[in-house]
Protein backbone atom coordinates (compact mmCIF):
# COMPACT_ATOMS: atom_id res chain seq x y z
CA UNK A 1 0.00 0.00 0.00
CA UNK A 2 1.30 3.45 -0.92
CA UNK A 3 0.95 6.76 0.97
CA UNK A 4 -1.76 8.11 -1.34
CA UNK A 5 -4.31 6.57 -3.68
CA UNK A 6 -5.25 8.72 -6.67
CA UNK A 7 -8.61 7.72 -8.15
CA UNK A 8 -8.84 9.23 -11.62
CA UNK A 9 -12.15 10.31 -13.17
CA UNK A 10 -14.45 7.57 -11.85
CA UNK A 11 -17.40 9.57 -13.12
CA UNK A 12 -20.77 8.52 -14.46
CA UNK A 13 -20.09 9.71 -18.01
CA UNK A 14 -16.98 7.50 -18.24
CA UNK A 15 -18.72 4.50 -16.67
CA UNK A 16 -22.26 4.36 -18.02
CA UNK A 17 -22.78 7.69 -19.76
CA UNK A 18 -21.71 9.28 -23.02
CA UNK A 19 -18.20 7.75 -22.94
CA UNK A 20 -18.96 4.65 -20.87
CA UNK A 21 -17.65 1.20 -21.73
CA UNK A 22 -18.25 -2.33 -20.44
CA UNK A 23 -14.63 -2.36 -19.23
CA UNK A 24 -15.20 0.79 -17.17
CA UNK A 25 -18.33 -0.66 -15.60
CA UNK A 26 -16.41 -3.84 -14.77
CA UNK A 27 -13.79 -2.10 -12.59
CA UNK A 28 -16.13 -0.10 -10.33
CA UNK A 29 -16.28 -2.74 -7.58
CA UNK A 30 -12.50 -3.19 -7.54
CA UNK A 31 -11.89 0.56 -7.33
CA UNK A 32 -14.39 0.86 -4.46
CA UNK A 33 -12.68 -1.99 -2.58
CA UNK A 34 -9.24 -0.43 -3.10
CA UNK A 35 -10.38 3.03 -1.98
CA UNK A 36 -12.05 1.54 1.13
CA UNK A 37 -8.87 -0.36 1.99
CA UNK A 38 -6.84 2.84 1.78
CA UNK A 39 -9.36 4.76 3.88
CA UNK A 40 -9.56 1.97 6.47
CA UNK A 41 -5.75 1.98 6.72
CA UNK A 42 -5.80 5.73 7.40
CA UNK A 43 -4.28 6.58 4.01
CA UNK A 44 -5.32 9.51 1.85
CA UNK A 45 -7.57 9.02 -1.18
CA UNK A 46 -7.59 11.81 -3.76
CA UNK A 47 -10.24 11.83 -6.48
CA UNK A 48 -9.92 13.71 -9.75
CA UNK A 49 -13.02 14.88 -11.56
CA UNK A 50 -12.89 15.72 -15.26
CA UNK A 51 -14.72 19.04 -15.46
CA UNK A 52 -15.97 20.83 -18.55
CA UNK A 53 -18.29 23.77 -19.03
CA UNK A 54 -21.34 24.07 -21.29
CA UNK A 55 -19.21 25.39 -24.18
CA UNK A 56 -17.11 22.20 -24.24
CA UNK A 57 -17.60 21.54 -27.97
CA UNK A 58 -15.86 24.82 -28.84
CA UNK A 59 -12.74 23.93 -26.83
CA UNK A 60 -9.60 22.30 -28.21
CA UNK A 61 -10.54 18.99 -26.60
CA UNK A 62 -14.15 19.32 -27.75
CA UNK A 63 -13.07 19.79 -31.35
CA UNK A 64 -10.98 16.59 -31.15
CA UNK A 65 -13.42 14.57 -29.03
CA UNK A 66 -16.83 15.97 -29.99
CA UNK A 67 -18.79 14.09 -27.33
CA UNK A 68 -20.10 16.30 -24.52
CA UNK A 69 -19.13 14.72 -21.21
CA UNK A 70 -18.49 15.62 -17.59
CA UNK A 71 -20.24 18.98 -17.90
CA UNK A 72 -20.10 20.67 -14.49
CA UNK A 73 -23.23 20.08 -12.44
CA UNK A 74 -24.65 17.26 -14.58
CA UNK A 75 -25.25 13.68 -13.47
CA UNK A 76 -22.47 12.55 -15.81
CA UNK A 77 -20.00 14.84 -14.02
CA UNK A 78 -20.68 13.22 -10.66
CA UNK A 79 -18.34 10.62 -9.22
CA UNK A 80 -19.90 7.14 -9.35
CA UNK A 81 -22.51 6.62 -6.63
CA UNK A 82 -20.64 3.57 -5.33
CA UNK A 83 -17.70 5.86 -4.46
CA UNK A 84 -19.75 8.74 -3.04
CA UNK A 85 -19.60 7.52 0.59
CA UNK A 86 -15.80 7.59 0.37
CA UNK A 87 -15.78 11.04 -1.24
CA UNK A 88 -18.13 12.43 1.38
CA UNK A 89 -16.40 10.81 4.36
CA UNK A 90 -13.68 13.44 4.46
CA UNK A 91 -11.02 11.54 6.41
CA UNK A 92 -8.14 12.52 4.16
CA UNK A 93 -10.16 12.42 0.96
CA UNK A 94 -10.68 15.28 -1.45
CA UNK A 95 -11.94 15.87 -4.97
CA UNK A 96 -9.88 17.87 -7.45
CA UNK A 97 -11.69 19.27 -10.48
CA UNK A 98 -9.50 19.40 -13.58
CA UNK A 99 -10.30 20.86 -16.98
CA UNK A 100 -7.78 18.78 -18.86
CA UNK A 101 -6.29 15.29 -18.80
CA UNK A 102 -3.82 15.83 -15.97
CA UNK A 103 -3.86 17.59 -12.61
CA UNK A 104 -1.03 20.02 -11.91
CA UNK A 105 -1.73 20.29 -8.17
CA UNK A 106 -0.13 17.06 -6.97
CA UNK A 107 2.76 18.76 -5.14
CA UNK A 108 0.34 20.87 -3.10
CA UNK A 109 -2.03 17.97 -2.47
CA UNK A 110 0.54 15.29 -1.72
CA UNK A 111 2.34 17.00 1.13
CA UNK A 112 5.18 14.75 2.25
CA UNK A 113 3.92 11.62 0.49
CA UNK A 114 6.65 9.59 -1.14
CA UNK A 115 4.59 6.88 -2.81
CA UNK A 116 1.45 6.83 -4.91
CA UNK A 117 -0.97 4.31 -6.33
CA UNK A 118 -3.14 5.36 -9.26
CA UNK A 119 -6.31 3.79 -10.64
CA UNK A 120 -9.37 4.84 -12.62
CA UNK A 121 -10.38 5.99 -16.08
CA UNK A 122 -9.27 6.15 -18.83
CA UNK A 123 -5.93 4.34 -18.73
CA UNK A 124 -4.78 5.75 -22.06
CA UNK A 125 -5.79 9.35 -21.44
CA UNK A 126 -6.15 10.67 -17.89
CA UNK A 127 -4.56 7.83 -15.90
CA UNK A 128 -1.34 7.91 -17.93
CA UNK A 129 -1.33 11.73 -17.94
CA UNK A 130 -1.55 11.88 -14.15
CA UNK A 131 0.95 9.06 -13.66
CA UNK A 132 3.50 10.90 -15.81
CA UNK A 133 2.84 14.22 -14.07
CA UNK A 134 3.38 12.55 -10.68
CA UNK A 135 6.55 10.92 -12.06
CA UNK A 136 7.85 14.34 -13.20
CA UNK A 137 6.95 16.10 -9.94
CA UNK A 138 8.27 13.34 -7.67
CA UNK A 139 11.12 11.75 -9.64
CA UNK A 140 12.34 9.49 -6.83
CA UNK A 141 9.00 8.26 -5.55
CA UNK A 142 7.36 4.89 -5.96
CA UNK A 143 4.35 4.94 -8.30
CA UNK A 144 2.09 1.98 -8.88
CA UNK A 145 -0.81 1.61 -11.32
CA UNK A 146 -3.20 -1.25 -10.67
CA UNK A 147 -4.21 -2.42 -14.14
CA UNK A 148 -7.19 -4.34 -12.73
CA UNK A 149 -8.57 -1.05 -11.40
CA UNK A 150 -8.18 0.83 -14.69
CA UNK A 151 -9.91 0.71 -18.06
CA UNK A 152 -9.01 2.36 -21.31
CA UNK A 153 -11.04 3.69 -24.18
CA UNK A 154 -10.41 0.27 -25.75
CA UNK A 155 -8.65 -2.82 -24.34
CA UNK A 156 -5.85 -2.27 -26.87
CA UNK A 157 -5.25 1.33 -25.78
CA UNK A 158 -5.37 0.22 -22.12
CA UNK A 159 -2.53 -2.26 -22.78
CA UNK A 160 -0.54 0.28 -24.79
CA UNK A 161 -0.77 2.84 -21.97
CA UNK A 162 0.34 0.26 -19.42
CA UNK A 163 3.39 -0.53 -21.57
CA UNK A 164 4.31 3.15 -21.80
CA UNK A 165 3.96 3.60 -18.04
CA UNK A 166 6.21 0.59 -17.41
CA UNK A 167 8.82 2.17 -19.67
CA UNK A 168 8.66 5.30 -17.48
CA UNK A 169 9.50 3.27 -14.36
CA UNK A 170 5.96 3.10 -13.06
CA UNK A 171 5.14 -0.25 -11.52
CA UNK A 172 2.13 -1.85 -13.18
CA UNK A 173 0.30 -4.53 -11.25
Name these PLM-found stretches.
Residues 1-95, 140, 144, 153, ...:
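Active-site acidic carboxylates
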Residues 11, 51-52, 99-100, 122-125, ...:
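Short, flexible active-site-adjacent loop segments at beta-strand->alpha-helix junctions, enriched
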Residues 73-123:
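Internal catalytic-core helix/loop-beta-alpha segment
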Residues 103, 150-154:
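Short, small-residue-enriched loops and turns at beta-alpha junctions
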Residues 115-126, 144-150:
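Glycine-rich anion-binding loop/nest that anchors nucleotide
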Residues 127-137:
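Short Gly/Thr/Asp-enriched flexible loops that form oxyanion-binding sites at enzyme active sites
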